[in-house]
Design a protein with these regions (language model features):
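Class I S-adenosyl-L-methionine-dependent methyltransferase catalytic core
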Residues: 1-98
């Protein structure tokens, strides 16, 4: 998995094998964000990522400059992974909630 566009374009995301998730493919993310790019101003947007899993969509919004992002997942491993990855990439606008 990778971040498709924005300030962190091309950075890889390496989820641990103990997370029972199916991450959104790069192709699907690229298609989704091509549509959103023409409709919203990311810098003025607050995002709620439900069922965040690995945080793939969360990081994509952060890389594109979303104002603040809340990622929610029931799995504590997923939330911890999102927090760790956000800190690694310097995304200060991400909050992970279980």
């Amino acid at each position: 998995m990778r971040i498709v566009s924005g300030t962190h374009k091309g950075r890889l995301i390496h989820p641990t094998s103990n997370m029972a998730v199916r991450p959104t493919t790069d192709f699907a993310k690229e298609s989704l964000f091509n549509i959103l790019n023409n409709r919203i101003d990311f810098e003025e947007t607050s995002v709620l990522d439900l069922f965040a899993g690995t945080g793939s969509i969360t990081y994509e919004f952060a890389s594109r400059g979303a104002k603040d992002i809340t990622a929610i997942d029931i799995n504590p491993r997923c939330c911890e992974f999102i927090r760790t990855t956000a800190a690694t990439y310097g995304f200060l606008n991400i909050t992970a909630v279980r």
